[in-house]
Amino acid sequence: MKQWGASLAVMSMALLAACGGAASDGGTTPGTTAQLSVAVVGGGSVISQPAGIDCGVHCSAAVTLGTDIQLMATPSTGHVFSSWSGACSGTTPACSVAMNASRNVTASFVPASGASGWSNETALSAAGAGDPKVVIDAAGRALAVWTQLDSATTTNTSLWGSRYVPGSGWSAPQVLESNAGSISNIDLGMDRNSGRAVVVWRQLGTTYDGWAKPFDPGAGWGAATALESGGGAVDTGSVAVDGAGNATVVWSQIGPNTRFSIYASRYSFGGNWTSPVLIETNEVSGSQDGLPKVAALPGGGAVVVWKRSNGSEASLWTNAYNGSSWGSAAEVVADAGATQYIGSHALRMDATGNGMLVWGQLDTSNNALWYKRHAAGVWQGVAVQVAAPTPSVNQMSIPALAMNSAGTALTAWGIPDGTLFASTAAAGASFGTRASVRGASASLPTEVPVIGLDDQANAMAVWAESNGNLYLATRSAGNWGAPTPHENQTDVAAQPALDMNELGNAVLAWRQFVSGAGTKIYVRHYSSGR
């Protein structure tokens, strides 16, 4: 079992001992050592002779000046060694590094032709990182963003990011904004075909402000832009990117009537952001509108769903952008009175603009997931249960929802004993019989799984548990396999983020506690071989 306070094994001192570099007091003599740092890109590992480097676990060591260190690159299953860079060069797996100064070496691995499998887990960030978000495009290129402490002595966080390119691996992490306040409530959206993306976040200034930053595969990251200057605190936001690279961002913010209202802004690819627009007219004191979710439509439109609550009642509302203007807000799921309460919701659209809304709902002493479909710009009138309800006392699951471009949907949820369920629905059809992805046990999931779905309805689900482990379950040929641990670290793993493209390639990031250092963002990449 993992423990927060558990210590990692102390790295071998063989690199020093073999060269007589250890000082008599057990330390190192000042000026006699240099640092060897190794990075691994893709699926593989690197070891050294003398011992000390074993990367991806131990990727740096102090080495006596003047020593020649031999490095050996070994690909993981389904990968081949590609090349060295930095203080090593060439395409053969062995390399000798002359340590007459501190050196950096990178070993790159690429998927073997037609091979499938996961890359080794890799530490992507420095310490003090958390809240990762990931997306992957049709070509297998991925983005990861996360928050990271500015230093070990501050609580202020900044937004960082890295890009994955097949055959090249992850880029060096870079800070994505230069504002003074801490970052929270990140969302990351991408158009799979073009790879264009936008990240949005909340940042503490005089109050909480909303920010956004676009990404283009050819040009890289654009400028960070403040979305609003209304003075009221911003809460949560959501972003969707269409096939032209244009984006719709929606967020909740305290408006002129001192209540949370729903605002939107549009981004034109290569251009500017529009001024915020209030897209609902509730504005009743004591009633709050929040948790907006947005999905892009073909042709430049977008659909938004949010939750309206007064503390004892809740309903779901919607509005749509038609490519030139917003419509009128309308109730899509009504509150049925004191015996019902509506929880969190999820929204997805396919390539033709047909979509699905899924939400958790408590009715008397039962909880269940419900859904409505969106087709030809209209929401279906009657809500339908995903599966039979579960007896529960005041507990509802947050739903996870994925949809592929053809309209097949996958949803996942949990019940209080720790069981995780999933169900799929073909385009326009009802959900099938729920499947148990994970059974009840003493170690409980700490969150609802993150899920991905490809064009063949193969799927992945990843979650963290109270024992500190990260688990993966996969669906193939209509059946879920048994969950397996998906990281080999000693300490606690949490906050998984997963995305999967139509070909079944996937990217996974999570927050990993590292004893003696703090929390880092770790990543793995999956190649489907297609």
Residues of each region from the PLM?
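Extracellular modular ligand-binding repeats in secreted and cell-surface proteins
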Residues: 49-78, 99-101
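Extracellular, repeat-based ectodomains that mediate carbohydrate processing or recognition
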Residues: 112-530
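Conserved "repeat-terminator" motif of extracellular CCP/Sushi domains
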Residues: 30-39, 63, 94-113
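Short, solvent-exposed loop/edge segments of extracellular or virion-exposed proteins
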Residues: 37-56, 90, 123, 127, ...
